[in-house]
Design a protein with these regions (language model features):
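Small-residue-enriched flexible segments
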Residues: 1-54, 60-61, 65-314, 319-327, ...
Length: 371
């Protein structure tokens, strides 16, 4: 039996040649929806590439974006001209492409067979859009599951999104009806230390006190370091801001990883890459290969536990700080996913921020499977 999902990907300095190679890999077969991810070298040719894949496949509905890196089954393309394409033979009533120019189905509306028309969405967003976090939360409120998966476009220059046409700015993607069986999980790139702390005094992005103690003293104590040791360890130390009232997939705390941006030894202050709230609970985290690999496998097996049979295809949206930068070898992260999830069609990209549920994350990977 032929799979309803087909995959093609290629790297070549010429956009047309790369697209032709990827299309040839798809082989014969129909489809109603396509995903296309390109690296930034091909941004100037995005419209031509979209026109070409529409003509060659006969598929009108396309979504995707640009990434400094993109991925396919067992492979990642980083800082090289490349394209990854996946087509999906889904019934036409099961999905709806949206953008600033095309509205998604109304929340509460139904398909002809009675399914929720707006159940779950794969989304791509422009990182330069003002109030992007509020926009993501608003979009999550427009699907009945409350779940989104995707990421912010990443490029050193201009970014583009595909949503039946080439668009820029805002948020776009595809909304699926509840007829489409989808599962999604998130993996963190950091391991939290065991202690939780309450932010008892903060000013903008500065942690002044934790548990009514100087923030820097608490951090050094948790890490088991003195100031000299911290200078070496700071690069791999992060802050996890726990999200009140929410639980991560697989149990445990749902937390947002933020950078440690500075310390003030004299005043015992810690600066972070976010503006926390007074009374918010946080923890310090360490980033290393072992914890990243372990949590990636945890995510995969959480997903597999929910599956009655092997998944048909997958999408992977990961932080640009992951991939080769975190796993030490190009393609190592994607090979791990293939090894443990199966040799199935997979496409995605390395994002400037990852979208899961109704939030924007960092240093994470969001894996979505079609059941």
């Amino acid at each position: 039996m032929n799979s309803p999902f087909r995959l093609g990907h290629a790297s070549h300095s010429d956009w047309k040649t790369a697209t032709e190679i990827a299309l040839q890999q798809l082989g014969p077969g129909g489809g109603k929806l396509g995903f296309m991810y390109i690296t930034e070298a091909f941004v100037p040719y995005a419209a031509e590439m979209l026109a070409m894949v529409k003509t060659q496949t006969g598929i009108f509905d396309w979504v995707g974006t640009v990434g400094i890196g993109i991925c396919a089954t067992g492979t990642e393309y980083l800082d090289e001209p490349a394209v990854a394409i996946m087509t999906c033979a889904l019934a036409s009533h099961t999905h709806s492409v949206f953008s600033g120019k095309e509205r998604p189905p109304r929340l509460g509306s139904h398909t002809a067979n009675g399914a929720d028309a707006a159940y779950f969405a794969i989304v791509h967003a422009d990182p330069h859009t003002p109030d992007i976090e509020e926009l993501i939360e608003d979009m999550a409120g427009k699907v009945s599951s409350g779940y989104l998966a995707g990421g912010l476009s990443s490029a050193r220059g201009a970014t583009v999104q595909f949503a039946n046409q080439v668009v820029a700015g805002g948020i776009s993607g595809v909304v699926f009806s509840s007829d489409v069986a989808i599962g999604t999980r998130l993996t963190q790139g950091c391991a939290p230390l065991k202690f939780h702390h309450t932010i008892t005094n903060c000013e903008r992005n500065i942690l002044v006190t934790l548990d009514d103690r100087p923030a820097l003293d608490v951090m050094l104590e948790d890490l088991g370091l003195d100031m000299r040791g911290l200078r070496t360890a700071a690069r791999d130390t992060f802050i996890g801001l726990i999200q009140a009232g929410s639980e991560a997939s697989g149990g445990g705390d749902d937390y947002l990883v933020r950078n440690l941006t500075g310390i003030d030894p004299e005043n015992r202050l810690v600066a972070i890459g976010d503006t926390p709230e007074l009374g918010q609970v946080m923890m310090f985290c360490k980033r290393d290969l072992q914890s990243a690999r372990g949590d990636l496998l945890r995510m995969i097996y959480d997903l597999k536990d929910d599956l009655k049979e092997p998944p048909k295809a997958a999408l992977y949206h990961a932080c640009i700080g992951r991939g080769q930068h975190m796993f030490g070898e190009q393609g190592a992260e994607l090979k791990l996913i293939r090894e443990h999830l199966g040799d199935i069609p997979l496409v995605g990209f390395f994002a400037n921020g990852e979208i899961a549920r109704n939030r924007l994350y960092g240093y994470t990977g969001v894996l979505t499977v079609f059941k």
